[in-house]
Every structure is written in C-alpha cells, then in structure tokens.
Amino acid sequence: MDRRDFLKSTALATATAAATRLALGQEPVAAAPRTTDDDVTWDKAPCRFCGTGCHVQVGTRGGKVVAIAGDQKAEVNKGLLCVKGYHVGLALYGADRLTRPLLRKDGKLVPIAWDQALDIVVDRVLANPAGFAIYGSGQWTIPEGYAAQKLIKGGLANNQIDPNARLCMASAVTGFLSTYGVDEPAGCYDDLDRADVVVCWGNNPAEMHPVLFSRLVDRRARGDKLVLIDLTTRRTRTSAFADRTIFFQPQGDLAIANGIANLLLERGTWDRPFVEKFCNFRQTTDPLTLDGRPMTFDEYRQAMSAYTPARVAELAGVSPDDLSYLADLFGRRDLRITSLWCMGMNQHTQGTAINDLVHGVHLLSGHFGKPGDAPTSLTGQPSACGTVREVGTLAHGLPGGLVVTKAEHRTEAEGHWNLPPGRINPKPGYHTVEMWRRFSTPSDQGGDIDTIWVQVTNPARSLPNVDALFYPSRKLPGKFLIVSDVYPTATAMAADLVLPSAMWVEKNGMFGNSERRTQQWFKMVAPPGEARDDCWQTIAVARRLHDRGHPGMKDKDGKFLFNIVDETDRPVPVWDWRRYYDVNVDAQLFEEYRRFSRHKHKDLAPYAEYVKARGLRWPVVEQPDHTWRETKFRFVRGDDPYATKDDVQFYHSVTKDDRALIWFHPHQPPPEVPDRDYPMLLCTGRVIEHWHTGTITMRIPQLQRAMPQAYCEIHRADAAALGVADGEVVTIESRRGRVDLPVWLDGRGQPPPGQVFVPFFDESIVINLVTLENYDPLSKQPDYKKCAVRIRRRASP
C-alpha cells in the first residue's frame, strides 16, 4: 500500500478523495485532480485544519472557491491531502454562516450595526479594563494573534489573554523549555523519511495526522525497512500498521520512559560520550519549577534503578519483554529513532513530566541531532505553533519567546512597540481554566473577569467540565460574553454579543505549523454579508478606545498603537472597514512582529519571502547573496546557523552551558482512578472525518454523512457485562455530569476492558460535561484522557 492508497482507504477517503466534483451551492468544487478550466484562478494556501500544515491549491471563480487540489510544490504534503483537506473549500459555505453582528435582547440574539457592536465592546473595556479578557486560538492567523496580544499586553496592560491551545500543546511547550531552554521541535518532517524506527507515544497519527503517516506507509511500499512501534492505551488505525503494538495502562507512560532509561543504564547501552558532552541532570522540586534541582549522574542512576521491568509491569501493565524490546532499540547506535506524540502525552496531569522523560530517553541514548533521530511533538491546530507559541499569546508570554515576568523581556518588548517604560504588566494573566473559572464565579466572590471576548474557538464544547467552567457565567449578573466566529456555535448561541468573522481565504493570513514552518496566503474571495476579519475587529476596537481617551492605545510618541501606513509613510485609517484592504495590514504587522524573533534565534524572513515560498522553517537567516535560508535541524552544526561550537549545541540551555537537561520524574497515578462507583476510565479524542468540536466539518455534508454522530467505544467483554448491544444507547456518567450516546463495538478503535473512548466532535453530545479540569501543575493543561466513569443502559423515556 502506498501513500495515496493509504489516504484513500482511511475512513471515507475511498468515497470522497477520488471524487471529481462536489456540490457547493450553485458552484461545483473539484476535490482533485486539479481542474484545467481556463476561468478558474488558482493560488496557494495552507489547509485550514490540523497542525500538519499541508498546502492546497485553491481555485476560485465568480467570487467563490470552486476547487481544491493538493499542492504538488509543497514539501509538507507533496500534493496529497487527507479527507478533510480535500473538502476544505466547503468549509466556507455552510448554510448558517454568521453575516451580521447580533446582540442579546430580552433573551434573543437580534441584528445590530457594526458601529453599535464595536461601541459595546469598548464600553465593556472601559467599564473594567482589568476584568476584560481575550480567549483566542491556535486557529488565529499570526497577524490576528499578534494584534490581540498587542492590544491586551501593550495597550490594556492586564495580560488577560490565553488561547484554546492551552488545552492541547502547553505541556509540549514546558517540556521543550525545561529540556532545551527554548520551545518547539529540533527536527522536522524530514525525520520521517530517514528514521529506521518510529515510536508513537500514545497518539494515533494514522487518523489524526494522516498525510504525515502516509510518508511511513509510502516508505514501506517502496521496500524501506521501517519499524513502527505503537505505544497506546487502545487499539487504533495506527495499531493496524504497527510492527509492534504495546498496550499500557493510562498514566503508565511515565513508568515506561523511566524503565527504558533504567535498562539503558543497567546494560551500559546509553550514549556516554553524547551525555557527558551535551547533557546535565535534573530532578523535580517542591514547589515545581521549570528549572528543577541539579542532580548528579549517580543520583539519576539511583533514582531510575527503581523502575525495573517488574516494577514497570506493575505500574504500566507493559510486559518485561516489551520494555526490553524498546530499550534494545534505543540502545542501538546503528538505528535512527524518531518519537512522535500529541494529545496523549500533552493532555495529562503529568504532561510536562512525560514530555521531559521522552526527551530524556532520546538524549540518554544519543538519538538526537541526526536526520531521523528526533523527539517530535505534533500539534492539532494550524497555527498553535505560529500564533500561540511564537507570537506568545499565552497569559505569561510575549512575542518571540519573551515572558512578562522578566524585566529585561518587558523592556525589550516595550522597545519594539515604542511604549513608555513600565507599560507592560509583570504579572501573568489567568491561564485558560482559571480564566473561565473566574468568569463563572460571582464578582463578589473572586470572579474578577467580567468580560471575555472569544475569537476562533468554541469553549462551550471544548473546555473540560464545561458545566462548571462555562455555563454558570450565563446566569450571573455583570458577566458579558463576546464571540467572534463564522458559524453559530454553542458558544456563539450562548453569547451576549456575536461578531461575524471572515474565514481562511476570505482574508489574508499566515500560519505556523508543527515543524516551525511559517506559511502565507492572500485573500481570494470576499466574506459573506457583513462578516469581517478578526484582525480588523481588534484594530477597530483599539481605535475606538483611542478616540475615547484610553492612554494605552498610544505609543510613547503619541501614535496609535496600530499605526498602519501607506508607501509614503502616511497613516491609513484601517479601522474603517472600507479602507482595511487599501494596504496589506498582515505584512506590516508581521514585519513589526519579526523584530522579536531574533531573541531566541527564531529568526523570520521578510514577509515577501513567504509570498514566494510554500513556507519556511525558522530560524531563517539571510545569506551573503541576500537569499534566505531555512533550518531543517536545530542545534546541529552545519544546518542551524547558530550552532557553531560542536556537532550539537544547545545554545539556549537552562544551565547556560550549551547542555540539554535529562530529567528524573517519578511515576504518578492518574487524576482519577476507577472505584466501585465509577469503575471505568474515559478517554476523549478525535476521528479522521471531523476536527475538534465539529464547527466546520459537521457543516461539510460529505463529512457529516460519513460520521454523523459521536459514539462510545467499549470492549465486548464490558458490553456483555452491561448487557448492551452494538448501536444501543448508553449513559456515561462521572462525578461531574452525564451524556447519552450509542455504543460502537469493534469499530475503528477498541479499548481494553475497563476503558471507554468517546470523540468530542459532536456538539449535540457534550462529552465535556463528563471530563475533569485537573491540570498539569506547570503547563496548566487539563487531562482529557483519564476520568473515572460508569456506564449503564439508558433508562427508557
């Protein structure tokens, strides 16, 4: 089976990816191959869905997107797309697009004018600037996130901004920071083409990142010898392709990583020269910090010695033979090993710890710094890296890896923004769970967030324990919810004010994908009705604040915070929607933002370079001939321009000595363990047809028909014990809430006895009523993978 066969066979790609025409209102949409119609105009864009960053060719005619094709010139996907990518053009054309601002009056949302809507937002800010927050997204474009970041941290100076990416990749961030002193993977997708072994740590790339996974399938089809290891808590499509599937108990991944390290040390197969030259050792402290406490090699060896194969079998349910097999692979110098992970490691109350430990296994074994030797996290949103991690739209962050808690970082940011000294607040804002907890708490009981502006996300369905974190605010006096979105999501329908937004190629944009690749596209079609760019909305609010005298909307020279100019350097009133596209606002915001990028050697090229390219991987450095060169492998001399001392140089190391940190973290139990009342463990996740809460994909007819409803996977033995048959509706209940949904036995995935899997794409089946909000103490990322539940047959109505 080659890559194309794999993609066609995965889920409904058999039926849809091969289709040549798809209905789109009165216009056809080509799903591939690319049409040759003379009147179709083509341009490039990254896909709107996951963090892979596939490139598509977008065909437009008569002001509509009418065709989509994989981009043959793109290194990421080489012309291939998954089933969502082939249908991405339909994302714009759901029947219920939001086209006018809406205000809640007498319990109903009624249309209002944009001027009134913007004035309402400004009134809320001025009434309590400290209590105004923005909740954003890894689906923001880079300029959108940068504008929101500058408004909150450079203008309002309250730092109350956080993204939904806190829920999906925050633990990956803290893992990279605590290991290397700087965020994001050192390797890139090229590692998948060079690895001899790929280890999937609790993720399912066959469905979640199918175009990347197809690289592995294609290599096998060409006769390459490739070993795929699936470390997992349930059987998935990835398991079907794996050479060895190793099942472990939820939260057992920490013990497995420690067990591998112990065997490497015990057998003497760790890479002594690499470790002695490039690594230091660290252990956790109380309270926890990203820096930890130094430990000697002997202390590290002693700590790891407790994780014998027998002990790991007890903690993780992994056999000694399986653990020995993993240690044998990592102990071999003649192999190149790439580890992949995603939500299974990140949505974890010990997410930072397990990220650290997997990095540590690679460092201890020397499987780092060569093509195919890489620990690589994958992201789920198209710009969780570019807009969240790089622009710094987290409660504590500033662009380019700066943080608000460091005086020198605040000074640098104030310099880039031309702000008066002291403008930036040194106190971090609230992380996502705390932000929504405060919003859902009465103002006189500590609920000091009274207005949240949600952009490009659906927290009414994506927050954990949503009945505690989201819905109480809807009944509290003084709380006000603003939502900018393209469709009437559950969040929008609960809002006090709804602002209709432009989407994807209805606006200019830039994304940053999982391999540090920054991507650019131009507006190709107009948004419907009165829908407008999120970036414009932010700038328009800032201008009205400026005009009403808010001092934070001016820099230290008295200029407007968003001073966009024409080619003669004259200000352009881009806050007036009629003038917004007189100039390229994205280009000017990006050029301002990229000044930050050199602080942690995340250098970005000029905007014009991204117009020409299918993305560039940072750091991107200008060459003597004035061309711009991207970096495939960070910290590696000969490829990374900042690695100059040795073959590998960790030039942002926590210990300031060019050494990475190998951590010891002890095994910890899950946040909830099964008991007599709640005897099973629930894990939530995604399916190939749908993306996140289904806002877009459930409005694409082909995808909705293929997977119309969420379901519950349980083992046949559990179904027999419960007396339920395939397709029968059951009730899943936790200490927090309950949902009813049908059982699917022997479907795509199969959990072991005692475990349950439910996808979260279905707005009508709110599985996050059941989940818990316990989070990692460092990353503040919640655990969606392990909560105790009970299942019973649904009572008759």
Identify the residue ranges that each predicted region occupies:
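N-terminal leader/propeptide and maturation segments of large enzyme subunits in energy/redox metabolism
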Residues: K105-P111, T269-P320, V525-D647, L682, ...
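Catalytic or ion-translocation cores adjacent to nucleophile or general acid/base/metal-coordination motifs
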Residues: M503-M524, E530, Q750-P753
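N-terminal export/assembly segments and adjacent metallocofactor-ligating motifs
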Residues: M1-T269, K277, F281, G292, ...
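Glycine-rich phosphate/diphosphate-binding loops that line cofactor/substrate pockets in enzymes
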Residues: A117-F132, C188-D196, A303, S324-T338, ...
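Short beta-alpha connecting loops at secondary-structure transitions
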Residues: A240-F248, R517-P528, R699
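Long, contiguous, secondary-structure-rich segments that constitute the structural scaffold
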Residues: D534-D603, D677, T693, T697-E713, ...
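Extended redox/cofactor-interaction regions of prokaryotic respiratory oxidoreductases
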Residues: Y146-I229, L254-N258, H359-M493, A502-G509, ...
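Conserved short loop/turn motifs at secondary-structure junctions
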Residues: Y135-T141, E314-V318, C342-T349, G380-Q381, ...
